[in-house]
A protein has these predicted regions:
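Conserved short loop/turn motifs at secondary-structure junctions
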Residues: 103-111, 170, 264-267, 290-297, ...
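Short beta-alpha connecting loops at secondary-structure transitions
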Residues: 205-212, 443-458
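N-terminal export/assembly segments and adjacent metallocofactor-ligating motifs
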Residues: 1-231, 260, 268-269, 356, ...
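A glycine-rich phosphate-binding loop feature that marks nucleotide/adenosyl-phosphate handling sites
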Residues: 109, 241-243, 279, 322-333, ...
Length: 695
C-alpha cells in the first residue's frame, strides 16, 4: 500500500508543494505536486532528495555536552532538561556579570517562523545582538531600492515585457519557479541582457551578455545612468513630475569619465551604450537583481543605482515593468522584520548592537562586529551565544578569525541537524528537527499558506522554534511553549488555528492585478513622496546621497587575478555535503578558470589548485576549464566543508571554504555592513601534496 502525504519542502523560501510517498516498508520517495500553481510539479534536486536529510544516519538525535576542547568533537549525551538548565544558568550568569548585550543570537537563511522566534528571545533577554545573514543577503537590495523608490519592486514579467536584464542572478538554478514567466516573455519577443562574470543559463541564451569584472557593478550602473542622462534618453515626464534630485544627479554624472567606468568593468563603451539603449527604448522593461549584488561594501549603493535606472527609464508600475508589492500576508511572523517584534526594543537602543551599520533600518549586529567584540571586548564584551540553523565557520567572513573568536567565548550553544564545524565549537549542541518532523504552517512563493504534515519523529530532536521557546522559559523570560498557541499566532491574519488549516489543507492567496501608476494618487513612500535620485536622508546620515563608484580592492603583481564565487545548484549554502545523493552530483569543490590561465600556471583540468588572497589565506579546489570566462577572472565554489573528515580540522572547514579568503574589512563605504566577496585580488597555482576528500 502506498500512502501519499502532501506537504511543503522547507529547504528554501520558495515553499514548493511536494507529495511524499510512503510504502508498506516505511520507505519514502518525493515527487513534485502537479497541483501546485507555482511549481506545476517541478522540483529541484535538493527537494527531490530532502528525505535523505531526515533519515541520514549521522543526524543529531540527543542533546550533547562537550567534554574535550572546542573543536575536538568529544561529547557526552545529556537529557533535554539538563541541557536547558545548564543553558539558562550560563546565559543568565553571563548577562548578570557582563550586561544584557554580552549574549548574542544568530540565525541563518530563511527558515519560516524560526528566525522571528529567535528575535523574540533576544527581545525578551533585552539583548540587541541579534544577527542574521542580511548584510550579504537581501538587506542591500531591499534598503537600496526602498531608499530610492519607497519599496522593493518586483518584476511583472509577462507578454508585455519587452526587455529583461538579469543582473547578478541565475533564476534557472536558484528560483526555477520564475522561469515559466521569463520564458513566456522571451517567446513573445523580449530582449534579454545578462550581466554576470560567468556564462550562466541566462548569459548563454541572452541577446547581450556583459561579462564584467567581479565587483564592478556600480561602475556599470553609473555608466548606464551617465549615458541615459547625457543622451537625454530618460523619461522626461516621469523624471520631471515624480523624481527628486535630478539636477543633482545630472551634475554628478557630468563629472564622471565614461571611459574610466567602462575600463573598470572591462567592457566597451559601445557595448554599454547598446544595452542601455535596448533597455531605455523598450516599452516595458525589468531589471532582475540577485544575491551577487548584496555582496560587497558598495552593495547598498549598487541597488540604489539600479533603482535609479528603473526610474529614469519610466518602468515603474507599468504593465510588464517593475511592480509594487501589494496585499497583506496571510501569516504573521514568517520573517524577523515585523514592526511588532522589531519595535520591542527602541531604534536608539538597537543602534548599540555590535557592528551596527549606518543605515538604521539594518539594526542587526554584524558578523564582523560580533567577532571583534569577542576578541577585543570592544565596544563591550560578547561572552555567550545561541546559534540556530547556521554555520558561521563557513558563512562568516575570515573563517580563521571566526574560530579564534569562538575560542574566546565562555559558552556557546548550537541547534543543528548535523555535527557541523560550528557545532564542534559549541559547549552544548541541541538536536533540531527537520521540516518533515513537525506539523506546522508554510507559505508558498505566491503567498498561499499550507498545512505542513509531520512524517515521523527522529530521536529526541525538536523543532527550532520550540527549542528557542524552551530556552527562554528556562531563563525565566518566556512563557511555557504551547504548540497550538504558537501556530494560532502565526495564523492570526486569517483567524484560524492549525487544526482548522489542516482540515482545509491550504488557503490560497487572492490573485490581484498588478497595481499600475499608484503613485499618481499616493506618491512614493519616501520623505519627498517622489523617487529619490538624491537622498537627503542619506546626506543627513553622512552617507553618499547619490551613488559614488569607488574602485574595488586593487590587483597587484602578486595578486593579478580576481576571484568571485557562485552557489551550487546541488546544495543550500554549506548544507547537504553529507547527503550522498547530492554529493554524487557535485563531489568536490570546483574552481573555474580559463584554459589559457591554466596553461600559464601549468594547471590541467582535474588538478588541485591553490587559490590565495594573502599568504595566510589559501584554499584548495579542483580545476575546471571554462573558456567563456575572462582570463583574469576565476570562479570558486562556496561554503565547502567535508563532513566525512569528522573532527579533523573541524571537518576540513579551512581546506576549500571560500570564506577563508575573505576578511572582515568592509572598507570605508559599507553603508549596510556588507563585506568584500566578489572580485577579491588573488593568485592561483598548482597545489602539491593536497588531496580533497570525497564520500
Amino acid at each position: 500500500m502506498n500512502n501519499v502525504i502532501t506537504t511543503t519542502c522547507g529547504l528554501c523560501s520558495t515553499g514548493c508543494r511536494i507529495n511524499v510517498h510512503c510504502n508498506e516498508h516505511n520507505q519514502y520517495s518525493i515527487k513534485g505536486d502537479k497541483c501546485d500553481p507555482v511549481t506545476h510539479g517541478a522540483l529541484c534536486k535538493k527537494g527531490l532528495h530532502a528525505i535523505d536529510i531526515m533519515l541520514h544516519p549521522e543526524r543529531l538525535t540527543q542533546p550533547l555536552k562537550r567534554t574535550g576542547k572546542r573543536g575536538e568533537d568529544q561529547w557526552i549525551t545529556i537529557s533535554w532538561q539538563q541541557a536547558l538548565d545548564e543553558i539558562a544558568l550560563k546565559f543568565n550568569h553571563t548577562q548578570n556579570t557582563f550586561g544584557d548585550n554580552s549574549l548574542f543570537f544568530s540565525y541563518g537563511y530563511s527558515k519560516d517562523f524560526i528566525n522571528t522566534q529567535l528575535l523574540k528571545l533576544a527581545n525578551a533577554a533585552n539583548s540587541v545582538n541579534i544577527h542574521g545573514p542580511e548584510t550579504v543577503c537581501w538587506a542591500p537590495s531591499k534598503y537600496g531600492k526602498e531608499y530610492t523608490l519607497g519599496y522593493n519592486p518586483g518584476a511583472d514579467i509577462n507578454q508585455h515585457t519587452d526587455c529583461i536584464i538579469f543582473w547578478g542572478v541565475n533564476k534557472h538554478n536558484t528560483r526555477f519557479t520564475e522561469m515559466r514567466a521569463i520564458n513566456h516573455a522571451i517567446e513573445h519577443g523580449a530582449t534579454t541582457i545578462c550581466v554576470d562574470p560567468q556564462q550562466t543559463h541566462h548569459a548563454k541564451n541572452a541577446n547581450y551578455w556583459l561579462p564584467l569584472v567581479p565587483g564592478s557593478d556600480l561602475a556599470l550602473a553609473m555608466a548606464m545612468i551617465k549615458i541615459i542622462i547625457d543622451k537625454a534618453w530618460y523619461d522626461t515626464v516621469f523624471v520631471a513630475d515624480f523624481c527628486y534630485g535630478f539636477s543633482a544627479l545630472q551634475s554628478h554624472v557630468d563629472q564622471l569619465d565614461l571611459s574610466y567606468l567602462a575600463n573598470e568593468c572591462q567592457l566597451s563603451i559601445e557595448m554599454i551604450t547598446d544595452i542601455t539603449q535596448q533597455y531605455i527604448n523598450a516599452k516595458s522593461a525589468v531589471i532582475i537583481t540577485g544575491n551577487a549584488l548584496d555582496h560587497n561594501p558598495d552593495s547598498f549603493q549598487v541597488n540604489r543605482a539600479i533603482a535609479i535606472l528603473m526610474a529614469l527609464s519610466g518602468n515603474i508600475e507599468i504593465q510588464g515593468g517593475q511592480s509594487k508589492p501589494q496585499g497583506k500576508s496571510l501569516v504573521n511572523g514568517r520573517w524577523p522584520y515585523d514592526p511588532q517584534d522589531v519595535d520591542q526594543i527602541s531604534p536608539t537602543i538597537r543602534q548599540h548592537s555590535v557592528g551596527s551599520p549606518p543605515i538604521p533600518e539594518s539594526f542587526r549586529a554584524t558578523s564582523q562586529g560580533l567577532m571583534d567584540a569577542m576578541l577585543t571586548g570592544q565596544p563591550y564584551s560578547i561572552k555567550a551565544g545561541l546559534i540556530v540553523g547556521t554555520n558561521p565557520m563557513t558563512s562568516w567572513p575570515d573563517s580563521n578569525k571566526v574560530k579564534q573568536a569562538f575560542e574566546q567565548l565562555d559558552f556557546l550553544v548550537v541547534s543543528e541537524l548535523f555535527m557541523t564545524p560550528t557545532a564542534m565549537m559549541a559547549d552544548i549542541v541541541l538536536p533540531a528537527a527537520s521540516f518533515f518532523e513537525y506539523a506546522g504552517v508554510t507559505q508558498g512563493q505566491d503567498g498561499s499558506i499550507h498545512y505542513q504534515a509531520s512524517l515521523q519523529q527522529v530521536g529526541d530532536a525538536k523543532p527550532d522554534h520550540q527549542i528557542i521557546a524552551e530556552i527562554g522559559h528556562a531563563m525565566g523570560i518566556m512563557p511555557v511553549y504551547n504548540d497550538n498557541d504558537f501556530w494560532k499566532s502565526a495564523l492570526s491574519p486569517v483567524n484560524i488555528d492549525l487544526m482548522q488549516l489542516k482540515a482545509q489543507t491550504s488557503i490560497l492567496a487572492a490573485v490581484e492585478n498588478q497595481q499600475t501608476l499608484s503613485y499618481l494618487s499616493v506618491g512614493f513612500d519616501t520623505p519627498s513622496r517622489k523617487v529619490e535620485l538624491y537622498s537627503q536622508k542619506l546626506h543627513e546620515l553622512t552617507l553618499d546621497p547619490i551613488p559614488v563608484y569607488r574602485p574595488n580592492l586593487p590587483i597587484t603583481d602578486r595578486y593579478p587575478l580576481r576571484v568571485t564565487t557562485a552557489k551550487s545548484r546541488h546544495y543550500m549554502f554549506s548544507h547537504g555535503r553529507q547527503i550522498s545523493s547530492l554529493r554524487a552530483k557535485h563531489p568536490l569543490p570546483i574552481v573555474k578558470i580559463h584554459s589559457s590561465l591554466g596553461e600559464k600556471e601549468h594547471l590541467k583540468e582535474g588538478d588541485i589548485a591553490a587559490i590565495e588572497t594573502a599568504p595566510d589565506k589559501i584554499i584548495y579546489q579542483r580545476v575546471k576549464f571554462d573558456d567563456n570566462l575572462n582570463i583574469d577572472t576565476i570562479i570558486a565554489d562556496l561554503s565547502w566543508w567535508f563532513p566525512e573528515m569528522k573532527s579533523k580540522q573541524l571537518s576540513g572547514a579551512f581546506i576549500s571554504n571560500y570564506n577563508v579568503l575573505t576578511t572582515t574589512d568592509t572598507g570605508t563605504h559599507s553603508d549596510i555592513g556588507s563585506f568584500y566577496i566578489n572580485g577579491l585580488p588573488c593568485r592561483i597555482y598548482k597545489a602539491t601534496n593536497i588531496e580533497l576528500s570525497t564520500i
